[in-house]
Amino acid sequence: MEISGRLINSTPDDNSILYWSNVSTHVDENYQIIFPQNTEFGTFHCKEYFCHWPITTEAFRGVEEYKHGLDASWWKNHPVSNSIFAHNLKEDFIAGYDHGKNAGTMLAGNHHISKGGKFWTWGPNSEWDTKILTENAGHYIELMTGAYSDNQPDYSWLKTNELKTFTQYYYGIRDIGGGKK
């Protein structure tokens, strides 16, 4: 699927912008979050907390379990709900892959424009998402990409009458064991 965006400021004042798109997908213990191999760090909203990626060696957001070598690329390992952004994204994709189903989703776009890549999860220990947000679908994760911003709420700006454009692609992937570069 191709998403082409046009952000236009038709006002007489400079204005902030924040664009993020979201793909939600079912997750279980076989699901892996894939950031490019050269991603060294993850960060939380506002770049307030950082962790090594994919193996964390520090408490993240005050959660001690993350400092014991937790592999944060696996959904099953997150002890709490969490949001992790790929810090300083240098490639044109992020992905998620269910190794049990041999299928996943890849989000792609020019990383100089689509600067942000992240995931949000309620985590495997939460029942809130399964009771409130779905009828019987089980746990899910949100893979997200941002244009002109690498974090939330890290705004970008549009000058008066300025136009910014971007193109992002969402791919279904199958039988490739994930993704890397």
Residue locations for each model-derived region?
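Generic beta-strand structural signal
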Residues: 1-5, 31
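Short Pro-Gly-centered flexible turn/kink motifs
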Residues: 2-3, 156-174
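Beta-strand elements of well-folded, non-transmembrane domains
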Residues: 7-11, 147, 170-174
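A contiguous, surface-exposed recognition patch within enzymatic or periplasmic domains that forms
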Residues: 10-162
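Charged, amphipathic alpha-helical linkers/stalks
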Residues: 173-181
